[in-house]
From Swiss-Prot, chains A, B:
Binding locations of NADP(+): E83, G141, A142, G143, G144, A145, N165, R166, T167, V168, S169, K170, M232, G254
Name of the coding gene: aroE
Highest taxon of the lineage: Bacteria
GO annotation, cellular component aspect: cytosol
Residues that bind shikimate: S15, K16, S17, T64, N92, D117, Y234
GO molecular function: NADP binding; shikimate 3-dehydrogenase (NADP+) activity
Stated name of the protein: Shikimate dehydrogenase (NADP(+))
Keyword terms of this UniProt record: Amino-acid biosynthesis, Aromatic amino acid biosynthesis, NADP, Oxidoreductase
Length: 288, 288
């Protein structure tokens, strides 16, 4: 029997998820149908579209911009949230809470939310062989993308964490909120800076801003160094990566994070682990 | 495998369709799940909700106020419309055009629209034993409800048809549009009147207005008589029926039409005919 999945967003035509998950389905030998699902940008429409999908017998949904926070609210009021989703304050993966279904709770009341973005980043770095355990890490950006990776990074054993943002107060607020939301995070001292003041040596620096979209560049000082530089963006020239590659750092864009988070969602839905290295190679052949 | 259905409307909490179709499923021995589906009142939300439902593997959807015209537009641009839906200019039943699916057309492009409201009325009258063949029929009202029953009545062999409306011009416009939309209707001369001017003897008079909701009464003259009076409304006191029952007419409200249109939708989706008399009795036991 075909298992049905969607990725819901607005806009959505550009999403690569259908091709990625269709390849996963082939790799896992499962009959799946994964499609893009447009939705008007309001909470009532999102809830209605998600309800209709799960009413129809859908198995799982990915959630992308602008619905990750709305999905969070939806699940918080129904079937619950994973710890990563709770701390991230956002959901990118929807499924049905099987325990609740078994108790006869209707599908739409059993909606459960997870967030695999952060773990997808960590898994990609580990595949790259970057030394997360004991690492001195800096994240540039204090929005949703940054929020989603802090806990997974801490769980991966990093030593120290700094968060920098154009306006430092936003970074401070993020740290306060995260420390309240998670005891694990609360045990870490997280330094905060204005981006222009971030300096010194780090093992890993992560660009969690969408500045790559606008062609602007980050105000990075020359006194800022790292061994590894990661930009969550992909599919375009990334000045952030160039800045550090000419200074001898190893760099990576976020395409592997995209595959990583997708593989984790797929596993969440089907219980089947994906050989991400093999899938990435296969996808690169598809997309070139 | 569970077959999934929804009724989509706004508001929708009041809909009786889930109970009706669940009973049909039991009667037909099919594993079905039929649920109410709220949707924000705009075309983009409706299209997104319907797409998500069929993406999820949904089999069929009923459409009620305020989406019947939007559903019509949706299907006209995709998998097509039945003749009844085309002439009614509205869709109450959505399914997937199997011929298109077989050609690899994706579900959302194979969306097919039917309208079973009018035939549901005709079938109910025939169950009541009312003599449609050769009947002189009058319809009061010139909105969507009236529009949906003209072709089925003509196909049932009525002799003459008059359409009355508070403002007669609306009835005239309806007749013009219907005659253009259907050759069968075009061959009939349909008289039009202001409701207050409708008089003489009819076999059947149908109230296709929603005046029953507001508690107002229709401006019916004493020179208007009929053997059978039908009000499409149900579930409340209906002054229209009282007006004619005290004048010796046989009367019926529209509950049987609701069951009739549902049975036709069910048959459209599953290929299984429903024993409507048996179902109606069973439902009356459920609802009392």
């Amino acid at each position: 029997m075909t298992q049905h999945f969607i990725v819901i967003g607005n806009p959505i035509a550009h999403s690569k998820s259908p091709e990625i998950h269709t390849l996963f389905g082939t790799q896992a030998g499962l009959d799946i149908c994964y499609q893009r699902q447009y939705c008007p940008d309001d909470a009532a429409s999102f809830t209605a579209v998600i309800e209709a999908f799960f009413h129809g017998g859908g198995v799982g949904a990915n959630v992308t911009v602008p619905f990750k926070q709305i999905a969070y609210e939806c699940c918080a009021a129904r079937g619950g949230l994973s710890e990563h989703a709770k701390v991230a304050g956002a959901v990118n993966t929807l499924l049905l809470n099987k325990a609740l279904l078994a108790k006869g709770v209707p599908p739409v009341e059993a909606l459960f939310g997870d967030n695999t973005d952060g773990q997808g980043l960590v898994n990609h770095m580990q595949r790259l062989g970057w030394p997360l355990n004991g690492a001195r890490v800096a994240i540039i950006g204090a929005g949703g993308a940054a929020r989603g990776v802090v806990l997974p990074l801490i769980e991966a054993g990093i030593e120290t964490l700094s968060i920098a943002n154009r306006t430092v107060s936003k970074a401070e607020i993020l740290v306060d909120e995260l420390s309240t939301a998670s005891e694990k995070i609360n045990q870490h001292t997280i330094q905060t800076y204005a981006t222009a003041d971030l300096s010194g040596d780090f093992d890993i620096i992560i660009n969690a801003t969408s500045i790559g979209l606008s062609g602007e560049t980050l105000p990075l000082t020359d006194k800022l160094n790292c061994q590894y530089a990661y930009d969550m963006m992909y599919g375009r020239e990334l000045p952030f990566l160039q800045h550090f590659s000419i200074r001898g750092a190893q760099t990576s864009d976020g395409y592997g994070m995209l595959i990583g988070q997708a593989a984790l969602s797929f596993e969440r839905w089907t219980g089947r682990a994906i050989d991400v290295a093999q899938a990435t190679t296969a996808l690169e052949n598809v997309s070139t």
